[in-house]
């Protein structure tokens, strides 16, 4: 029965297709039949039995999943493309999608869900199955719609285009819009596309790709196996569009086809019409910008069915079902009916074999199918009747729930996010509500679309516009009102706040002003009160101090009327000093009492500190005893006037004049004390030029200078420096001298010219006190006689500096002392004049048989003291020659004793002081031999002070006279010339002047030492006779050239700790000193060739690393290198090679005129003292000169050529290493003796000889003056003390930094760990790891390797050091010089430097507790930068008892290349970047 019903329906549909141009009722019946067929097909699919596997696969569609439609894709016409806003969220969710075998078509997107209808194919012409009937009915309606659209007017077609152009894709509406629909599906309308529309409109033709219509070729396997024929349709004949508002962004078309077999599509279209209440003809699509209007004929063409609440003929929503169609006629039994014909639009194909087989099967089952169709029709009629009676939606059939796909089991309905049904089978979605009729029951009846007038549309638009405008106007008005109200409120609030703020500010300001005013008033009041109190107290003190002064002066004048003027002055001095002390004790102030001056003092020029724009009156303050000077002046005036009233008046006047100055001086003292309070000053005083501040220690003084130099007090900039003058000591000396002059009886007639013995003793005393080799400042420390002091100062002032050719300027202290002595000498009418020639000629002679030389010298040279018949010094009468000779030198007072040098350690100074007595004992052993020698060389005092004398002021000696004396002495005694070493000095014309070996300040410490950046020459060896004697003279010359910039060193020669008790191997050396003149400045180059035994190589290498050991062995291998290693050269003459020296062996003839040589001695032309001599003495001196010149001329002519040849041979042997160190002692002595004989015989430079006899061994002096060449001994105990390798300490002093190997660095690190005192910062670690080393190289090698360098801007960092000459590998570059401090001081200084912002660190460790700080005091070595691939290395060398840091060249350094070495910082977390830019750069310093 069912099969018969299907066939009838198909025939009915065919008849309806043929009558497609009938009225609307036919159309409605067609729609009803379509729906009926759909429902029947839907119900029959579950009960149909499968004939074969292919049938089951096609007909059992409800059992398949909703996504299995991909396997049945046949083309565009057989698909239902449903677009929904939920598609994308559903696809992107966690839902599992079943994979299919058939791939998607190229134009199909995953976001578009395609549902295949239960029909087999919409293009099949005939079908006996249920699927065929449905597709046939569907295609019938489509064809009807297309045919209806053909008759439409042009206006309607244009309107369709307008609708098409208004469609928009609202993908941007991500949030849920306010849809008037119950489901969240798209808003759909139906538009038909005519075949002619493709040719007229180009935009619609591109909506569908031909690929969508022609994709059925590859899906033939899904077609039903029934005997039906399939035909392909062109996209232009049968394409319908469904407009969707929710398309994805990657969609290219806005509409797709629709099949009316799906009731949901019709249902959605109906809801679009019924959603708008006011105007039922507008489409309320949210996605459309403008509402759309559909005419009645378009609504008819849509073919809306009223089965689910569609519209009837009058376009009213009706719930009544349409009238039932007449039952179809019964099918003929025999023969079977032909298959239905296809519509004329479709082009059919011939049936395939499968279709024929299927038709045969249908014919066999025809009766069974007709019965099924009849049963179906009866069931449908019953259902329709029930629906009409109940007027409600039929219940959902739940019979297929068991066959629901597993994918949709978890698909539960969510009211907030409803899920759209994806298939036309409503039974699969029980949770989805299809409320079709209930939704529209409350809606009023709408007017038909035909009654709508287009003229109403503008009116409605104007009405809405006016309404909206009024609404917006009210809103803007309210908005402006609220804005103005808020603005006014804020303005008032801000106004009040500003008013309150200003009021509070003024109130606070007034209150602060009143407070400050009261405070200032109280401060000024207290200050004025204190000032008045001090002024009154000072006035009272002055009255008490000066009131007894007239009485003391009157009594002294009355009682001592018969005494001399000098006695009066002495009495006045004592009385005024007593009054001054009594007045100051009442003050009970710490700084008011006269305190004995401290040796640790600083000076500040008085020009820096001015009061009221003027300097303080000198009379008001001259040291701490300034009041005494004022009283002395007043008392002197009173004594001269002999009037008490005048005395009082003078005192009052002076007090009034000095009143203001005293208060100003006190203010300055207070300010200075406050400024230097942190360093614990002892006393503050001043003299004519400086303010002085005494401290308790040299460390406090140095710190005060370092920190406060350049600081300001108010607007005064302080120029702080070490105390240079010694005014207070001079005042004490003047007082002592006045006492001595007053107490001693002075003989009237005493002539030194007639008393030669007294003259000798005076000279011996001067030599013992070193007055002949010291400056006028040092004379004041060892005060002797006023007359001798005056004479030496007079000669000192007349002396012309041989280097600068300028007269020396005596400072204020010297002038003051000289003036004081002149006053004393004027009173005693004594004018002594002592010639230097007499003093030098007999400095230390004793009563010996060889004293005739001194007596002959004095008879020929005027060396006597001319007293002009006015008397002699008071102490000459008491001179006892024996007592003066045997009496030891009194020790210096604690104030006069020089402080310990800051550069050297305390143990060294103590050792020097303690060993003085031992050296005296050693010197006493040679007294027997000294008595037999000439006084010039054999004096005990001369032996002790031979080196210190050279370092003092220059010795002005006439070389012509010395040569004559030595020549005469040589012919008289005929001693054999036997010696251990020979010394040859070749001088130029200007070099006959003895260089200035001077040092003005005995208290000079290391601060002065480090002020010159290149003060390398300050390195000194132990000055004992056992030290390296061959370098003594050259060392002094070197010091002279280093210190000729004004920074002098006056240190006494330090004694050796060994005291000559440890015997060292003897050494014989040959020293040659050459003086040349270059650019107006004399330079001396001394080459010392050692012939002593070389230290054992194993002993040296034991304390050295591999590199140093190889270097030492290489040096020891050649005799030439050994000589150069132990040779000494001055840094200025170092560039002169040996060939240059040998190229100019001849020397110009020195001038014999004293005036040409700029010697400040007695001459006939320019010396006034020479003219004061008696005429017999002048004649005698001229005659001596003439004889002296003749003898020298003869001697020079004889030996001119021999000395040159021998000198060249001597140099060539020394430089080429021809001398053999293993020669016997006899051979060396013979060679030296022969060379010295030839040199002395051929002396072309006015060189003289002298003979010494020490322990039976004769020694010949080359220069004729032992002072100029250094005293040498051949005694075994005191001959030579060889320098040894420094022992290795805890920190590895011998571990050199030159190797740069891992072994040396690791050993250094281990030694550091054992020390346990590692620094905690990278800055302080810099001086821990810069490198250590030790070398047997002495000071001689250091001086010979000195190079020319300069500092300028560096590419690495700030400033750098650059080479000005080519430096060979392993040559010395420079010494690292700075302040020598202890570890604790270094730690404190580092913290202070960090606080001051000093970024660079210049601390260099020497040993465990010795660090060199070059931050403020140092030389150019402080500018050497770090490099990971350096060209230099740092070594620590032990020279004498001192350790020096020497920078050596690691490789050859070219001119202009920067000098660098490795800082060797430890590894730390905080890295310091490296800027060396070398290929081996480690990027960090630590």
Swiss-Prot record:
It comes from Dictyostelium discoideum (Social amoeba). Residues 1-64, 83-148, 201-231, 309-360, 409-429, 532-665, 812-1103, 1130-1255, 1278-1327 are annotated as: Disordered. Catalytic component of the COMPASS (Set1C) complex that specifically mono-, di- and trimethylates histone H3 to form H3K4me1/2/3. Binds RNAs which might negatively affect its histone methyltransferase activity. COMPASS recognizes ubiquitinated H2B on one face of the nucleosome which stimulates the methylation of H3 on the opposing face. May act to regulate chromatin-mediated events. GO terms for cellular component: chromosome; nucleus; Set1C/COMPASS complex. This is Histone-lysine N-methyltransferase set1. GO terms for biological process: epigenetic regulation of gene expression; methylation; transcription initiation-coupled chromatin remodeling. Residues 1347-1464 form the SET domain. Keywords: Activator, Chromatin regulator, Chromosome, Coiled coil, Methyltransferase, Nucleus, S-adenosyl-L-methionine, Transferase.
